């Protein structure tokens, strides 16, 4: 019996600190220490079970109903979590095959269910006023019919194009992370360029046109009191003046309810989200998108004349009609090549520093006295190399004098010759 005195150290009342409201029948065990001693004596009298189960843990001393309730609770909780996540967590290759169709389907879901439209009927007085103020004279060739526009976007709802682009790129980024785990797909992206033919901007203009029986006006807003109040996320203190385009009558739906079940399950599998819903942090932020023309800078080409980065000298020489004699190259000794490279390096330095002109002439004459047989090889190569280097400077690698007529980002035509920003996407115009 002396070995069983340690049973008193098992404080059965301590289970309340872990699970306070699991089972109320265990509260009857909690009592004065003398009751616990009585329980210890009872356990001592029935010590055969403890002797047989010497390796059991302290949890075996708990009541049987308490152990059963714990197991049932864990099993129910685990089954709920498994049923909740297994329905859409797996993404198969069949979901995104072919990838072109998946891209169009993904973009169409965003346009159809995450963007809502609010239109109002155009009154006759406003329509006639627009017709009178549209043309300068009555004989103008371009006239707007009085019964052409019947509905227009509600001006009280204005949605920046930047918000739509931010939402699309956020969801595309989440889908691309899921696509990276799939094998057998070459293009691991579900997104399309915003300014492409089948991109977001063209699809948006096609569904919500600027002209027609139902029109959605575009407005260009700048930093003002209105923009600070309605769109505080687009007003950045680092930017002196922010310009962006809003579309009247459009609004973003954060939790669409009319999405079909099949499309909703595909969207959740593709993005990895628990539900078909978005939040304000997915699109309400400032993200400038500026696309510049890819032009070679003439200044960088001048600085890179001695090294010719990225250009094969043999190809450059062959384009100018100069072909080196293979037999002469084989019999050319190595000291002459080293001396030719030093001469070409000094020659290109004379372009930037005119005071080294006489020094290069003296070195060329000195080379002619020591290597008379190789003098006729150095001069043609230097002359043709000089022509090949200076010819791109006189070509078309110069910035255009006139400004661009079309926007590089969305492809829309500028309304005026003095426009500094695009009226569609708000990007800055090049050449001004």
Curated annotation (Swiss-Prot):
Domain of life where this protein originates: Eukaryota
| Composition bias, Polar residues | 312-335
Q: Where is the stretch described as Disordered?
A: 37-61, 127-151, 298-378
Q: What residue spans carry the Low complexity bias annotation? A: 341-366
PANTHER family in UniProt: C2H2 ZINC FINGER CGI-62-RELATED (PTHR13555), ZINC FINGER C2HC DOMAIN-CONTAINING PROTEIN 1B (PTHR13555:SF36)
Q: What protein name applies here?
A: Uncharacterized protein At2g02148
What species is this protein from?
A: Arabidopsis thaliana
